[in-house]
């Protein structure tokens, strides 16, 4: 014999979503810092310097929603114009810029966190604009005189989404080492990853990327840290679009060259809901509960597609579009430039939720849920 009981269930956000991560210690953001290369140029200035006259290519640059980018342009040739640097010179450029910008971003980040180099216990470096062995982490440790006992990791070649992959790694390290400071450092010398062949394919890439480095300090087990805590990650690789974004060897150009399929903004947008729904699954949260969206500044069309498919407002992505306008696409560290702007804005309140979103080769979408 049974009794039927009428029940009404109301799903509310969990008071402490840290249980979702399965971690006994929750990682919090402790500080952020950014750096760029020495010189910036408007899109018109780049076109004039590179002597680009093709109206279609000029239109790509001038309709990119980018005002300025920090770039280290090719050297001038004796007869005027610019020299197309060989791959060896580009690798040297990457090493010099990535280390310089990375050191400055790291120092700014530690200052923001109220910490010093001697407090650093784990350094995870991210780059895709060049290849280094020993890795960028080793070079920066030597350059800044960081304790050689500092543990380190390098994420290389994952592209624009890699900053969140690194945060996932360092958040796990942080939870296992409460009270110790870890840093995610993204350093991308996009000026070292170009090809000049007059085609529309390379024009799109050359119009988009800029040099930049961003560092994020994290720590667990210290409730005094005011930054948001990391609650959950979600990842999705669109295997049918594996070749839609890639950085590989161009035999005709005798160098590495980046390829972006024209359909990639729509591919990313069409799959954004899948990842967002997985991220919020089991939390009791809806997308409308998210107060702050920090999306990778991948390009005007990519941002527009994400906005439409996730039902966001232009205000939601104001930092994303602002970073694109002022810097261009900074690859793996773009979302941290946006986070820095949000932190400086001072509008977050305790209990607010935020979503970090990056997109890159694979084609890949990464997301993280955070709470202040």
Swiss-Prot record:
Pathway(s) it belongs to: Antibiotic biosynthesis
Reaction(s) this enzyme catalyzes, per UniProt: 4 malonyl-CoA + 4 H(+) = (3,5-dihydroxyphenyl)acetyl-CoA + 4 CO2 + 3 CoA + H2O
BP-aspect Gene Ontology terms: antibiotic biosynthetic process; polyketide biosynthetic process
EC number(s) given by UniProt: 2.3.1.246
Keyword Transferase in annotation: yes
UniProt keyword annotations, A-Z: Antibiotic biosynthesis, Transferase
Coiled coil: none
Entry annotation: catalytic residues: 160
Mutant phenotype after disruption: Cells lacking this gene are unable to produce balhimycin.
GO molecular function: acyltransferase activity, transferring groups other than amino-acyl groups
Protein task: Involved in the biosynthesis of the nonproteinogenic amino acid monomer (S)-3,5-dihydroxyphenylglycine (Dpg) responsible of the production of balhimycin antibiotic. Catalyzes the Claisen condensation of four molecules of malonyl-CoA to yield 3,5-dihydroxyphenylacetyl-CoA (DPA-CoA) and three free coenzyme A (CoA). DpgA requires the presence of the dehydratases DpgB and DpgD to facilitate the aromatization of the DPA-S-DgpA or DPA-S-CoA intermediate.
Annotated family: Belongs to the thiolase-like superfamily. Chalcone/stilbene synthases family.
Protein name listed in UniProt: 3,5-dihydroxyphenylacetyl-CoA synthase
Species in which this protein is naturally found: Amycolatopsis balhimycina
Record lineage: Bacteria, Bacillati, Actinomycetota, Actinomycetes, Pseudonocardiales
């Amino acid at each position: 014999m049974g009794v039927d009981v009428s029940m009404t269930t109301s799903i509310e956000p969990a008071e402490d979503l840290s249980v979702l991560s399965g971690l006994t210690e929750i990682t919090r953001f402790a500080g952020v810092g950014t750096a760029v290369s020495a010189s910036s140029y408007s899109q018109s200035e780049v076109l004039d310097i590179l002597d680009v006259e093709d109206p279609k290519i000029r239109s790509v640059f001038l309709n990119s929603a980018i005002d300025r980018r920090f770039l280290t342009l090719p050297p001038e040739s004796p007869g005027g114009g610019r020299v197309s640097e060989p791959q060896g010179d580009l690798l040297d450029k990457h090493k010099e810029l990535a280390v310089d910008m990375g050191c400055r971003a790291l120092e700014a980040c530690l200052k923001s966190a109220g910490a010093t180099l001697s407090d650093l216990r784990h350094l995870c470096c991210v780059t895709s604009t060049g290849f280094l062995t020993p890795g960028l982490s080793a070079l920066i440790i030597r350059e800044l005189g960081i304790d050689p006992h500092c543990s380190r990791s390098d994420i290389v070649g994952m592209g624009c989404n890699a900053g969140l992959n690194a945060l996932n790694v360092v958040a796990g390290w942080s939870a296992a080492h409460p009270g110790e400071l870890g840093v995610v450092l993204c350093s991308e010398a996009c000026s070292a990853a170009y090809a000049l062949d007059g085609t529309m394919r390379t024009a799109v890439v050359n119009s988009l990327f800029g040099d930049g480095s961003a560092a994020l300090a994290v720590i667990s087990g210290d409730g005094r840290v005011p930054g948001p805590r990391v609650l959950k990650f979600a990842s999705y690789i669109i295997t049918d679009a594996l070749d839609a974004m890639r950085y590989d060897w161009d035999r005709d150009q005798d160098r590495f060259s980046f390829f972006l399929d024209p359909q990639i903004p729509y591919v990313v947008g069409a799959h954004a809901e899948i990842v967002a729904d997985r991220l919020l699954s089991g939390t009791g949260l809806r997308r409308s509960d998210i107060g702050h969206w920090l999306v990778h500044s991948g390009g005007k069309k990519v941002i527009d597609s994400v906005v439409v498919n996730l039902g966001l407002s232009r205000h939601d992505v104001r930092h994303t579009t602002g970073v694109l306008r002022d810097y261009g696409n900074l690859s793996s560290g773009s979302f941290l430039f946006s986070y820095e702007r949000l932190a400086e804005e001072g509008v977050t309140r305790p209990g607010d939720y935020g979503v970090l979103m990056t997109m890159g080769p694979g084609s890949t979408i990464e997301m993280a849920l955070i709470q202040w």
